[in-house]
A protein has these predicted regions:
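N-terminal "first-domain core" detector
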Residues: 1-2, 23
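N-terminal helix-turn-helix DNA-binding core of bacterial DNA-binding proteins
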Residues: 12-48, 52
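Residues within the DNA-recognition helix of helix-turn-helix
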Residues: 56
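Residue-level detector of family-conserved "landmark" positions at structurally sensitive sites
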Residues: 39, 52, 70-71, 103
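Amphipathic alpha-helical dimerization/coiled-coil segments
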Residues: 2, 7-9, 87-113
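A short, conserved structural fragment
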Residues: 61-72
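Short, cationic-aromatic polyanion-contact patches
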Residues: 15-21, 37, 71-95
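Short, intrinsically disordered/low-complexity patches at protein termini
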Residues: 49-50, 59-62, 91
Length: 113
C-alpha cells in the first residue's frame, strides 16, 4: 500500500529529524527567540564536534529544514550568517506537538546560555 503524499512527506521528515544531532539543532533553534550564528550554536551545543555540527547544518539547509540568513552589514568580529527554522520545520514540529512546549524549551535554552 502506498501512503498518500502528505503522509509520505511527514514520514520522511520524521525519519530525517530523528537523527539526534539534527533534532538537537532544530530544538535549539525552536527555543531561541532570534536566529543563531554558527558560533552561538557551537557554544550552546558544545557536546557536538564542530565538523559534525557543520555537516548536519548543511544537511538541514539542503533539505529546507533551516533557513540561513546572511547579513551584509557587520563588523569584522561579528557573525555574518544566522540560522532559523524554516516553515517546513515549524510545520513538522507543530504536528508533533513540540511548538506547544516552546516555553519549556526556551527555559532550558536560557539555562544553557
Amino acid at each position: 500500500m502506498k501512503l498518500p503524499l502528505k503522509y509520505e512527506n511527514k514520514r520522511k521528515g520524521l525519519e530525517f529529524i530523528s537523527e539526534k544531532t539534527r533534532y538537537k539543532i532544530l530544538l535549539t533553534l525552536l527555543a531561541s527567540e532570534n536566529p543563531l550564528s554558527f558560533s552561538r550554536l557551537k557554544l550552546i551545543l558544545s557536546s557536538i564536534p564542530e565538523n559534525s555540527l557543520n555537516y548536519h547544518i548543511k544537511i538541514l539547509k539542503e533539505n529546507d529544514f533551516i533557513k540561513n540568513e546572511k547579513r551584509t552589514e557587520y563588523k569584522r568580529s561579528e557573525p555574518r550568517s544566522f540560522y532559523s527554522l524554516s516553515q517546513r520545520s515549524i510545520d513538522l514540529l507543530e504536528s508533533l506537538g513540540l511548538t506547544e512546549v516552546k516555553e519549556e524549551f526556551q527555559a532550558l535554552f536560557e539555562q544553557m546560555t
